């Protein structure tokens, strides 16, 4: 289980941080839960969060790119379940590369909470469902908000040193 090795993360105060959540609607039972739980976690931490929905995983990067122009951070959520063709690999690679490029191009946190799983049961177990081992929507939100604070800390320290 990928939960092994997950670091303990301190509770953060995300007051004043704006975050967009971009979620696919494909595999709705999974994506709806990821979306709702990520937004609820942002609200719990004090962030200003807005949610947006796109059809599938391939539409996520372009919506994330637009959101990154307006928000401090973006959380991308979706669920790609392996089928019998190579399409799974193309979709997963495309989404991951797109999100990484956007983060580097904008210098903004883009949290990748797009599940890439072999079975629907694996997706449920990572979606924050009752009894699930993991909650990737909450984890992605936590990572995005924490990274905003860390980037601000880096800028502040560099500025104090005249860098």
Swiss-Prot record:
<feature type="binding site">
    <location>
        <begin position="79"/>
        <end position="81"/>
    </location>
    <ligand>
        <name>5-amino-6-(D-ribitylamino)uracil</name>
    </ligand>
</feature>
<dbReference type="InterPro" id="IPR034964">
    <property type="entry name" value="LS"/>
</dbReference>
<dbReference type="GO" id="GO:0009231">
    <property type="term" value="P:riboflavin biosynthetic process"/>
</dbReference>
<dbReference type="GO" id="GO:0005829">
    <property type="term" value="C:cytosol"/>
</dbReference>
<feature type="binding site">
    <location>
        <position position="112"/>
    </location>
    <ligand>
        <name>5-amino-6-(D-ribitylamino)uracil</name>
    </ligand>
</feature>
<protein>
    <recommendedName>
        <fullName>6,7-dimethyl-8-ribityllumazine synthase</fullName>
        <ecNumber>2.5.1.78</ecNumber>
    </recommendedName>
</protein>
<dbReference type="Pfam" id="PF00885">
    <property type="entry name" value="DMRL_synthase"/>
</dbReference>
<keyword id="KW-0686">Riboflavin biosynthesis</keyword>
<comment type="function">
    <text>Catalyzes the formation of 6,7-dimethyl-8-ribityllumazine by condensation of 5-amino-6-(D-ribitylamino)uracil with 3,4-dihydroxy-2-butanone 4-phosphate. This is the penultimate step in the biosynthesis of riboflavin.</text>
</comment>
<keyword id="KW-0808">Transferase</keyword>
<comment type="similarity">
    <text>Belongs to the DMRL synthase family.</text>
</comment>
<feature type="active site" description="Proton donor">
    <location>
        <position position="87"/>
    </location>
</feature>
<feature type="binding site">
    <location>
        <position position="126"/>
    </location>
    <ligand>
        <name>(2S)-2-hydroxy-3-oxobutyl phosphate</name>
    </ligand>
</feature>
<dbReference type="InterPro" id="IPR036467">
    <property type="entry name" value="LS/RS_sf"/>
</dbReference>
<feature type="binding site">
    <location>
        <position position="26"/>
    </location>
    <ligand>
        <name>5-amino-6-(D-ribitylamino)uracil</name>
    </ligand>
</feature>
<dbReference type="GO" id="GO:0009349">
    <property type="term" value="C:riboflavin synthase complex"/>
</dbReference>
<dbReference type="GO" id="GO:0000906">
    <property type="term" value="F:6,7-dimethyl-8-ribityllumazine synthase activity"/>
</dbReference>
<dbReference type="InterPro" id="IPR002180">
    <property type="entry name" value="LS/RS"/>
</dbReference>
<comment type="pathway">
    <text>Cofactor biosynthesis; riboflavin biosynthesis; riboflavin from 2-hydroxy-3-oxobutyl phosphate and 5-amino-6-(D-ribitylamino)uracil: step 1/2.</text>
</comment>
<feature type="binding site">
    <location>
        <begin position="57"/>
        <end position="59"/>
    </location>
    <ligand>
        <name>5-amino-6-(D-ribitylamino)uracil</name>
    </ligand>
</feature>
<feature type="binding site">
    <location>
        <begin position="84"/>
        <end position="85"/>
    </location>
    <ligand>
        <name>(2S)-2-hydroxy-3-oxobutyl phosphate</name>
    </ligand>
</feature>
